[in-house]
């Protein structure tokens, strides 16, 4: 290892946004590395094999939401699957792809995955295994990606439907 950089990942930063940010950080780091190698000011350091991690290949199945998980876990999955393959869940007879969501500070005693409400300025409120989540932007079956409030202006969103159910 020649040089390294560290960066925080924002709470709702998507994989695509992080990729773009890391490209800039990586470019700057590459220039510093080349400069340091030319000046002889960089000493290679062996990587600690005990600290390495394995990242499996991402498939469409990776993005399928398990609503029994906590709202923060589901939110992180949604961010991590944006822009491909997008987090998704069964919705009525189709697939709902979720582009963005926000964790809600409320709990629910309803079934995990149940659509609880459509709240103005917040989104579609969903019960999770622990906590609740607002779906903000989504792609409903046979539709394009859009804010869920905009979608609801022209389509009925039935409360009480449980997402992820066959």
Which residue stretches match the model-derived regions?
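Active-site-proximal loop/hinge segments within enzyme catalytic domains
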Residues: 1-104, 121
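An anion-binding loop in the catalytic cleft
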Residues: 68-166
């Amino acid at each position: 290892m020649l040089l390294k950089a560290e960066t925080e990942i924002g709470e709702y930063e998507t994989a695509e946004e992080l990729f773009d940010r890391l490209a800039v950080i990586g470019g700057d780091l590459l220039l510093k590395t080349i400069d340091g190698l030319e000046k002889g000011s960089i000493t290679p350091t062996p990587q600690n094999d005990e600290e390495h991690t394995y990242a499996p290949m991402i498939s469409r199945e990776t993005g399928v939401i398990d609503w029994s998980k906590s709202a923060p876990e589901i939110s992180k999955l949604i961010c991590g699957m944006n822009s491909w393959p997008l987090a998704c869940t069964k919705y009525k007879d189709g697939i709902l792809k979720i582009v963005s969501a926000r964790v809600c500070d409320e709990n629910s005693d309803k079934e995990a995955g149940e659509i609880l409400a459509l709240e103005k300025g917040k989104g579609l409120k969903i019960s999770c295994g622990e906590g609740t989540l607002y779906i903000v932007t989504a792609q409903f079956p046979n539709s394009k990606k859009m804010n869920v409030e905009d979608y609801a202006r022209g389509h009925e969103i039935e409360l009480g439907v449980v997402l992820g159910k066959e």
